[in-house]
Amino acid sequence: MNSALAALIGLVLSIVLIIRKLSPVYSLILGALVGGLLAGWGLETTVAQMISGVKDITPAIVRIIAAGVLTGMLVKTGAASTIARSIIKALGQKYIYLALALSALLLTAMGVFIDVAVITIAPIAIIMGNRLKLSKFKLLLAMIGGGKCGNILSPNPNTIIAAENFDAPLSSVMAAGVLPAIFGLLVTVFVIIPLMPKGELMEGELQEEKDEQLPALWRSLIGPIVTILLLALRPIAGIVVDPMIALPVGGVVGIIATGHWKNMSACLSYGLDKMSGIAILLVGTGTLAGVIKASAIKDVLVGMLAGWSNGGTLMAPIAGALMSAATASTTAGATIASASFADAIVAAGVTAIWGAAMVNAGATILDHLPHGSFFHATGGSMGMSVKERLKLIPYESIVGLVLTICSVAMYLFV
């Protein structure tokens, strides 16, 4: 069987198994195995390609585990809640959608997972929604839209692994996402949300915010600022501080600055727990990426885009979008797309930095489909049923599409 068709069958099998609620990791490994065998490679060669795919992303997995220190600091010390509440308080009720979106953007941009960012902000959104009788759909889209914008400029696993597979500096890939993220935020808040139907309004008992012992805003910001400064040393001064060092150093400094050094173990355990799940998932995506990379599927995609103007450029976001749709995950989508198509994208004349940035942006278009955990975690945070949550999918995709179009336009015209 043609290796491109075989790899595609393996990918479809993985999707079906994930939808059927089988473990995503085992679904991806099984899909990779079936794809390789159908391609006629034999068991030994198939396994070799699967292991090769995992080896390619091993450095990124190590960096992602190290990033757990910063994530643990932001969530367990209360720094994330402080930052979100400060933004919402500063902008006030009149600009509540902007406040929620900006809070989600900044939290994800600092290294908080997008689903964790939404869950962190959701209690405040519910309180404000009940108080002002706002649409729960618009409230959730504001948080998800802001989170997607922050995700393309964050030191989160999707950006780390895209940069790694394209051999591009993480700080430069993050910087490439800044303007698309700002534009995406403005479009989300001032265009998409106003055009949405109101849907069901928030109704319920008015709740008061819990009086938690949270760190001061300036203390909460120290850890992320240290991380950003360390990563910025490469483009500014030519001093290379690897993300494997910068991210945990920023996290440890943040833990000390917020006065939670006695709870450092809890912060580290939380971060490791969040990242270990991603790391294990990436082992599965690595096996499938190895099979896809060894197949002729990239040649088929190149052939399909050959007649298009800027077809090589479009390969990056299209690959990101298709793979994120297959896995319903930004990280897994960016992993498979960048590991499988990076060489072809760079060979088409796209720079490594913008190749990684466009794959990353493309991975936000369809990463919220129902066979992924993000769909259910975010819907649950606002008390939505599956039927209600499904209504948001088109609007989420529009946000991702805006980010992608802006990223491609910046590469082509700026």
Residues covered by each model-derived region:
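Short helix-coil transition sites and intra-membrane helix breaks within transmembrane domains
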Residues: 20-24, 58-60, 71-81, 108-120, ...
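Interfacial loop-to-helix junctions that mark the boundaries of transmembrane helices
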Residues: 1-2, 19, 49-60, 167-179, ...
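Core transmembrane alpha-helical segments of multi-pass membrane transporters/permeases
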Residues: 26-29, 48-81, 106, 244, ...
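Membrane-interfacial loop-to-helix junctions in multi-pass transporters
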Residues: 1-4, 55-60, 87-102, 129-139, ...
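Long, contiguous bundles of hydrophobic transmembrane helices that form the permeation core
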Residues: 1-7, 11, 34, 38-39, ...
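Membrane-core helix-loop-helix motifs of multi-pass transport proteins
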Residues: 126-218, 351, 374-414
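Hydrophobic alpha-helical transmembrane segments of multi-pass integral membrane proteins
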Residues: 65-67, 90-124, 283, 308-350, ...
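Re-entrant/interfacial helical elements at transmembrane boundaries that shape
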Residues: 69, 82-85, 115-128, 156-166, ...
